[in-house]
């Protein structure tokens, strides 16, 4: 079996929230509204939406942005949400006591939310390097030659 190595993209940061006690359908309703938008626009949208799923998603987006700003020196204004997905987590099964000694089963669903932010200001340079890696090397060699002369 041949394994393809993924080239790590240094223009992306992510945050993963696991076991969030919420239905995947309710979380996807919010995630679909913010996918592909800028970071600042997303914060405004999430603060004004009346859904309970907005708060954990807002915390995850803020965490991903903090990762990018602290670890990668990204700029807040150039961040966009490149990937946002909600996956189903494990379901906790409980019993609710009812009248006359009976009980009804209750399913408490959880979900895993993944947010990936991309810095679009660095993306152009990265794509240029992937297409023509020698072009950037030639530019750096020209500047060294100019400095010597």
Swiss-Prot record:
Please give the biological process terms from Gene Ontology that the record holds.
translation
Keyword terms of this UniProt record: Chloroplast, Plastid, Ribonucleoprotein, Ribosomal protein, RNA-binding, rRNA-binding
Q: Which InterPro entries match?
A: Ribosomal_uL22, Ribosomal_uL22_bac/chlpt-type, Ribosomal_uL22_bac/org-type, Ribosomal_uL22_CS, Ribosomal_uL22_sf
What GO CC terms are in its UniProt record? chloroplast; large ribosomal subunit
Principal location listed in the UniProt entry = plastid
PROSITE patterns per the UniProt record, alphabetical? RIBOSOMAL_L22
Return the Pfam families for the record: Ribosomal_L22
- Spell out the molecular function terms from Gene Ontology: rRNA binding; structural constituent of ribosome
Coiled-coil portions = none
Where would you find this protein in the cell? Plastid, Chloroplast
Q: How does it assemble?
A: Part of the 50S ribosomal subunit.
What is the annotated role of this protein in its UniProt record? Answer: This protein binds specifically to 23S rRNA. The globular domain of the protein is located near the polypeptide exit tunnel on the outside of the subunit, while an extended beta-hairpin is found that lines the wall of the exit tunnel in the center of the 70S ribosome.
Similarity remark: Belongs to the universal ribosomal protein uL22 family.
Instruction: Name the NCBIfam families for this protein.
Output: rplV_bact
Please report the name of this protein according to its UniProt entry. Answer: Large ribosomal subunit protein uL22c
Q: Which species is listed as the source?
A: Pelargonium hortorum
Lineage in the entry? Eukaryota, Viridiplantae, Streptophyta, Embryophyta, Tracheophyta
């Amino acid at each position: 079996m041949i394994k393809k190595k993924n080239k790590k993209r240094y223009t992306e940061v992510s945050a993963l929230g696991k076991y969030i006690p919420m239905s995947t359908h309710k979380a996807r309703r919010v995630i679909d509204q913010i996918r592909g938008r800028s970071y600042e626009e997303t914060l405004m949208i999430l603060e004004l939406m009346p859904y309970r799923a907005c708060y954990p998603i807002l915390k995850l987006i803020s965490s991903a942005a903090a990762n990018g700003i602290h670890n990668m020196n990204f700029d807040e204004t150039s961040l966009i949400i490149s990937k946002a997905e909600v996956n189903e987590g494990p379901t906790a099964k409980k019993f609710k006591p009812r009248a006359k000694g009976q009980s009804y089963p209750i399913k408490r669903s959880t979900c895993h939310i993944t947010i990936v932010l991309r810095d679009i200001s660095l993306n152009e340079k990265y794509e240029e390097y992937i297409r023509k890696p020698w072009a950037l090397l030639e530019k750096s060699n020209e500047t060294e030659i100019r400095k010597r002369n």
